[in-house]
């Protein structure tokens, strides 16, 4: 949810230069973090006319809303739950062109990330390829302490890692993110603009490929 809000804020903040519109879909029925955040912030704001749109759509209803989303937004960001158990999550993943997998560079997190990617590659990515869809997947080291040996080992051996890593990583800044995380453009603090730049480049390359 943090990364979704950061990238949505970046796209919206640079919209005058790029002309891109962004819509955020929160399909996490249980936590609904971004959806709840926007509802709360809406009570603190006179108008949301200048804000990007946040939509609470259950994963079981995502596909039937695809036409509306494609017609109204250049970039659609989907905030997923942390597991595949929720109804419709796998089907929604089938619709995703660019998948970013954030993970902490710890042994347990890396193990879970590889297990998820193996499932995704065999059961979702393979089916997308059969149907003629291009898919771009990147791993994003998250909550990184650069001097930790686990992160250094990950970077040093990234050619052996099954998921291609993004060039950027998100540093450990839980307190800063918790204090400043927002869905309102007036609160966007440009803390991860480099991540936003790389994401736009990644999406652009995916479209051109």
Regions found by a protein language model. Name each.
Residues 87-107:
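Inter-motif core of Ras-like GTPase G domains
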Residues 25, 78-79, 101-104, 138-142:
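Conserved beta-strand segments of the P-loop GTPase G domain that flank and frequently precede/overlap
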């Amino acid at each position: 949810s943090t990364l979704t809000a950061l990238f949505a804020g970046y796209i919206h903040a640079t919209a005058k230069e790029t002309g891109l519109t962004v819509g955020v879909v929160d399909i996490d029925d249980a936590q609904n973090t971004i959806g709840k955040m926007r509802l709360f912030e809406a009570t603190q704001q006179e108008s949301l006319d200048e804000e990007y749109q946040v939509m609470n759509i259950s994963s079981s209803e995502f596909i039937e809303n695809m036409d509306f989303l494609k017609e109204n937004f250049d970039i659609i960001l989907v905030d997923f739950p942390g597991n595949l158990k929720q109804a419709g999550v796998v089907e929604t993943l089938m619709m995703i062109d660019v998948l970013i997998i954030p993970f902490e560079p710890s042994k347990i997190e890396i193990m879970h990330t590889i297990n998820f990617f193996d499932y995704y590659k065999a059961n979702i990515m393979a089916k997308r390829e059969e149907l003629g869809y291009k898919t771009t997947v990147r791993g994003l080291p998250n909550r990184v302490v650069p001097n930790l040996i686990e992160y250094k080992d990950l970077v040093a051996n990234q050619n052996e890692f099954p998921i291609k890593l993004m060039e950027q990583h998100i540093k450990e800044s839980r307190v800063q993110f918790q204090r400043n995380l927002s869905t309102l453009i007036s609160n966007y603090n440009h803390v991860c603009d480099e991540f936003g730049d790389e994401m736009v480049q990644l999406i652009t390359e995916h479209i051109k490929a």
